[in-house]
């Protein structure tokens, strides 16, 4: 679709098929390579069901985000929707926590990449897995941040290259795993699916990790679904560039479910092949790329790991470019100080990059590079958006504002699905064991506690103070809308 012309050039909008492909590419990332071990350990032979439940939940929330795009066509997704529904007072908190969540997500991805790289390069060295503050892993992490900064200096062409590299890497690795795995299963009559029982142990269910209620399959599935949901993260960012899409109010609600269904089918096929090859091997593996543990052939296993590594590298480059821009967008809108949006001669917002990189490094250090806890944190941090955006959609659907008058209401997508998203989000959020974030070896993790307080309380509070100080300075009163 060709849009309006700017300076003599036609602006090409993303059509329906392009939005579907964007959705698939946004969702399929490192998650499917990293999460199967933990999910099998938590759910045993029911691991595929955990991915199905995670996919259904992701689909519901994705439709909620897409439906909200019918009312708000500007870029920004959760920040734009919340601001339109409740005004700046709520929008500021969502915008700031969204930027923080993106920084955490980048840190988790960078941690996975560094851990995998060190294990591939130095497989028999104990120092490659050291978790101390001053360790080879920390130094490699800092070096990797430096490499990403250098790549950012090359601008958009480097980002396009990174996206292409990531797509090729993950497509090659998944295709090789599925095709090669099916060939082994059919020619050698391999079926180790039942070994998932040996890896399974029922997990106690406790509210917020404090009040234990019971122990059984339900509690295990709840935690397994949270971990599996990491493999679907990315769907919430599809609507970020709504202005670049052709008829987003019509295409997004149709494209996102198709993308989620396609990704879910790929994940189920991948997981089934992996569990047939060796469920117990995946669950017992100490490697970052758990999926490769099911493969007995060393060469084949290396191909999968390298493909996953290439995919993670590309995703990290894209995250290092996108996450700082969330801070600059808030600065451009007056929510944060303008110096956060200042760019150097290479068009890189250095202050925002430094803030993002600091948060990206801080959380993996606080959680001692623990992959399971980092995965949980990356998912739980997103629940602020998963709860507030559905509430915002309900408010937008009830709005009688002129700009929303032309939008056709649909009781199912405007009310039922948002309520389902809220209930499930709250249920999953209270099911998570937060002790893994706030405690370490039985004692308080003061580093992690301080980070949570600073990022989710202090920083938003400072944003509010800055915004209202600016409002008073220009002699205007902030609108509650």
UniProtKB/Swiss-Prot annotation:
Keyword Transcription regulation: no
Record's keyword annotation contains Glycosyltransferase: no
Keyword line: Cell membrane, Membrane, Transmembrane, Transmembrane helix, Transport
InterPro entries with a match to the protein in the record: AA/rel_permease1, APC_superfamily
Main location: membrane
GO terms under cellular component: plasma membrane
Gene Ontology molecular function: any one: transmembrane transporter activity
Bridged cysteine pairs (disulfide): none
Compartment(s) of residence: Cell membrane
Pfam family, one: AA_permease_2
Membrane topology per record: Multi-pass membrane protein
Record field: transmembrane: 14-34, 46-66, 90-110, 134-154, 167-187, 218-238, 258-278, 303-323, 377-397, 411-431, 446-466
Family in the record: Belongs to the amino acid-polyamine-organocation (APC) superfamily.
Matches recorded under PANTHER family: AMINO ACID TRANSPORTER-RELATED, ARGININE_AGMATINE ANTIPORTER
Entry function: Probable amino-acid or metabolite transport protein.
Protein name: Uncharacterized transporter Mb2001c
């Amino acid at each position: 679709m060709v849009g309006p012309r700017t300076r003599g050039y036609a602006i090409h909008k993303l059509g329906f098929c392009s939005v579907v492909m964007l959705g698939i590419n946004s969702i399929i990332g490192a998650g499917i390579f990293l999460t199967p071990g933990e999910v099998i350990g938590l759910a045993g032979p029911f691991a595929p069901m955990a991915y199905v439940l995670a996919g259904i939940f992701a689909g519901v929330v994705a439709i909620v985000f897409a439906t909200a795009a019918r009312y708000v066509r500007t870029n920004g997704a959760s920040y734009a929707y919340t601001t339109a529904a409740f005004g700046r007072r709520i929008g500021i908190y969502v915008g700031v926590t969204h930027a923080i969540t993106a920084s955490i997500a980048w840190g988790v991805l960078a941690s996975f990449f560094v851990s995998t790289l060190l294990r591939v390069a130095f497989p028999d060295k104990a120092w490659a897995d050291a978790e101390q503050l001053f360790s080879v892993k920390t130094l490699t992490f800092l070096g990797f941040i430096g490499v990403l900064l250098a790549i950012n200096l090359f601008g958009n062409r480097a980002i396009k290259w990174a996206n292409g590299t990531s797509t090729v890497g993950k497509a090659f690795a998944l295709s090789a795993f599925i095709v090669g795995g099916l060939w082994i299963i059919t020619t050698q009559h391999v079926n180790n699916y039942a070994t998932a029982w040996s890896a399974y142990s029922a997990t106690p269910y406790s509210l917020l990790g404090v009040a234990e209620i019971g122990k059984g399959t339900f509690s295990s599935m709840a935690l397994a679904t949270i971990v599996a949901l990491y493999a679907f993260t990315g769907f919430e960012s599809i609507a970020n560039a709504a202005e670049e899409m052709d008829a987003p109010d019509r295409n997004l609600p149709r494209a996102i479910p198709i993308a989620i269904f396609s990704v879910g089918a790929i994940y189920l096929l991948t997981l089934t092949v992996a569990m047939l090859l060796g469920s117990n091997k995946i669950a017992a593996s100490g490697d970052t790329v758990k999926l490769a543990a099911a493969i007995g052939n060393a060469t084949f296993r290396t191909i999968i790991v390298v493909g996953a590594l290439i995919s993670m590298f590309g995703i990290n480059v894209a995250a290092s470019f996108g996450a700082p821009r969330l801070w600059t967008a808030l600065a451009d809108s007056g929510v944060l100080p303008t110096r956060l949006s200042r760019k150097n001669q290479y068009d890189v917002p250095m202050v925002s990059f430094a803030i993002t990189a600091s948060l990206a490094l801080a959380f993996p250090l606080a959680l001692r590079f623990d992959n399971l806890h980092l995965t949980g944190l990356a998912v739980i941090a997103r629940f602020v958006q998963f709860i507030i955006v559905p509430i915002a959609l309900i408010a937008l659907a009830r709005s009688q504002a002129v700009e929303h008058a032309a939008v056709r209401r649909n009781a199912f997508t405007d009310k039922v699905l948002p309520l389902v998203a809220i209930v499930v989000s709250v249920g999953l959020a209270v099911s998570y064991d937060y002790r893994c974030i706030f405690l370490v070896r039985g004692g308080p993790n003061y580093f992690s506690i301080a980070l949570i307080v600073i990022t989710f309380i202090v920083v938003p509070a400072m944003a509010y103070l800055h915004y209202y100080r600016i409002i008073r300075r220009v002699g205007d009163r902030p609108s509650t809308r």
